[in-house]
Every structure is written in structure tokens, then in C-alpha cells.
């Protein structure tokens, strides 16, 4: 039997909120089987819990935000959720003392390290995968995203930026998902932004915590970060990272092929909602033997059964 996973112990970190610029403390704790990922705002009294579900994503401007019926939000969840998806964490309680997850270095890598530090614990319940049975597609102008049947989880992603530095890089990546491939090839890709947009963003109280410490920054011609890029194709790989996180609000690891052109947070969430609404397009499956699982979630550092 392939089992569900949570973290072995509580771990905590601090960082800066990308949009607020304020200090944020984040804690990740073990959670029971079949509870999923639940985020908790501990800066409110009483604390407010928001389950990570597709219908709770109600804001997708510059990030993915969970918002409850009272308008209480937790923003910028996508990089943390990419790490949770990449390491196959099914159940966790995530506490944060601010309206947003800390941006850290702009990638998922610090969250991967945090989860690895906590340890990964297998739980006494079968892991459920969301298997795609037929294609589901959403479009917005020339942008589109699609999930279709595939034995495993494949990403086929293309961006199209006219900026000379991005245009010079590889803008199309096809990869078969595994935990090792995610950690090595995707998790370190940072968010990126343009100097020309910063004045507008800050006038709208966005990106107040943004800097070259947590983003790739470009002017009209080049990357301004002194150390350059982490990957030659870091731009498209960060968009893939975002998509991993955005898709994980489906509640389970997906078995299928995700194909996308110029998609972002809004379209990614539309795709998840469209998929879940069409119940003949998917089914939940579990596996008895590891050899039967078409996706490799090799546990970093070994797992503990509980």
C-alpha cells in the first residue's frame, strides 16, 4: 500500500511578506489522515483556519490567495504548495501570523528544505491520486491550459515573453515529474519581475517586500541580479513551479499531462475548478505496490511509518 504523508515534527521559519514587506512567521505541523492541507491565521483572535481547496482561491492578482467567506485571506501560497506537492505531503497544518506566506528567496527551495528538516512520516491510510480520465481545457484569449490522461505526471509548458533576456532563454519545457526532478530542476527557480512594473505595484500596496534577494529583476534589456540566473531557463521553470503549487489545491497529486501556454495563477485555478466540476473527467485511485505507482515520490532522507 502507498500511504499518505505528513511531516514528522513541527518546523518554523521567518521571512518577509512579498506584498506587505512585513516580517512573517510560518509553522508547519503534522496533521491526521484525510485532513488535507489547512492554513491558519494565528494573528487573528480567535485564529482562523482556511482549508486549501480550489473554491477558496478567490484572488489571483500577482499570487494565489485563499479567501474565506468573511474575506479573511492568506496570500502567496503557491511556492509553499509547490514544495508540498513536490514532496508528496498530503496532510499538514500551516500556521502563519500574517495575511501572506513569506516569500523567502522567491522559489520553493527554502520550503523544500524546511519540509526535509521536519522529516516525512507515512500514515496508516492509502494515498489517493487524482487520475485524469479525459481532457479538460480552459482558455483566456491566446492563453490556455489543459489536463489530459497520462500514465504519470507530465508537464508541457510554454511561455512567450518579448523581453530580450527571456526570449533568448528556453521558453518551452517538457518534463516527467518525480520528487528528485522537482527538487533538482524546478524548486530553485525564482519569481521574476520587471523594474517598469515596480512603481505601479507599490502604488497598489503590492511587492513592498520585493527585492533582488527574493526575485529575478529585469530592466528593459537584461537581468539586474549580480549573480544572474540559477537555471538558463529559470523563467519558464518558475512558471512551472507556480503551476505545481496552483494545481495542488485540487487536494491530491494529479496523474495526467498538464499542457499550458502562457498560463498564470488565474487560469491554473480555473483549470482545477473546471476539472473538479466535471466528475466524469477524473477519479481517485490508490496503489497497493510502489512498483505500480506511475509517479516517483521518493522520500528525501527516509520516511517514518506511523
Swiss-Prot record:
| Source organism, top-level taxon | Bacteria
Whether Chloroplast counts among this entry's keywords is no
Its catalytic activity?
a UDP-3-O-[(3R)-3-hydroxyacyl]-N-acetyl-alpha-D-glucosamine + H2O = a UDP-3-O-[(3R)-3-hydroxyacyl]-alpha-D-glucosamine + acetate
Q: Which residues bind Zn(2+)?
A: 79, 238, 242
Q: Where is the catalytic site?
A: 265 (proton donor)
Q: What is its EC number?
A: 3.5.1.108
Q: List the keywords (alphabetical).
A: Hydrolase, Lipid A biosynthesis, Lipid biosynthesis, Lipid metabolism, Metal-binding, Zinc
Job description of the protein: Catalyzes the hydrolysis of UDP-3-O-myristoyl-N-acetylglucosamine to form UDP-3-O-myristoylglucosamine and acetate, the committed step in lipid A biosynthesis.
In the record, the note on similarity to other proteins reads: Belongs to the LpxC family.
Q: How is this protein named in the record? A: UDP-3-O-acyl-N-acetylglucosamine deacetylase
Amino acid at each position: 500500500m502507498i500511504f499518505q504523508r505528513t511531516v514528522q515534527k513541527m518546523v518554523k521559519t521567518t521571512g518577509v511578506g512579498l506584498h506587505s514587506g512585513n516580517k512573517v512567521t510560518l509553522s508547519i505541523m503534522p496533521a491526521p489522515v484525510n485532513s488535507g492541507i489547512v492554513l491558519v491565521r494565528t494573528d487573528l483572535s480567535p485564529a482562523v483556519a482556511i482549508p486549501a481547496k480550489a473554491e477558496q482561491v478567490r484572488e489571483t492578482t500577482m499570487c494565489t490567495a485563499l479567501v474565506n467567506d468573511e474575506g479573511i485571506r492568506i496570500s502567496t501560497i503557491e511556492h509553499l504548495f509547490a514544495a508540498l506537492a513536490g514532496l508528496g505531503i498530503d496532510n499538514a497544518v500551516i500556521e502563519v501570523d500574517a495575511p501572506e506566506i513569506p516569500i523567502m528567496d522567491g522559489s520553493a527551495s527554502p520550503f523544500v528544505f524546511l519540509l526535509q528538516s521536519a522529516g516525512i512520516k507515512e500514515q496508516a491510510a492509502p494515498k489517493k491520486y487524482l487520475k485524469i480520465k479525459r481532457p479538460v481545457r480552459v482558455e483566456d484569449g491566446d492563453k490556455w491550459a489543459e489536463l489530459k490522461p497520462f500514465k504519470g505526471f507530465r508537464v508541457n509548458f510554454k511561455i512567450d515573453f518579448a523581453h530580450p533576456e527571456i526570449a533568448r532563454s528556453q521558453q518551452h519545457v517538457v518534463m516527467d515529474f518525480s520528487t528528485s526532478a522537482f527538487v533538482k530542476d524546478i524548486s530553485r527557480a525564482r519569481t521574476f519581475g520587471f523594474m517598469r512594473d515596480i512603481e505601479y505595484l507599490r502604488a497598489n500596496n503590492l511587492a513592498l517586500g520585493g527585492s533582488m534577494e527574493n526575485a529575478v529583476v529585469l530592466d528593459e534589456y537584461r537581468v539586474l541580479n549580480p549573480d544572474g540566473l540559477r537555471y538558463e531557463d529559470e523563467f519558464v521553470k518558475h512558471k512551472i513551479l507556480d503551476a505545481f503549487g496552483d494545481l495542488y489545491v485540487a487536494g491530491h497529486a494529479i496523474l495526467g499531462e498538464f499542457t499550458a501556454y502562457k498560463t498564470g495563477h488565474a487560469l491554473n485555478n480555473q483549470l482545477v475548478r473546471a476539472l473538479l466540476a466535471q466528475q466524469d473527467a477524473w477519479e481517485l485511485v490508490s496503489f497497493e505496490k510502489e512498483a505500480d505507482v506511475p509517479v516517483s515520490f521518493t522520500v528525501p532522507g527516509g520516511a517514518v511509518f506511523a
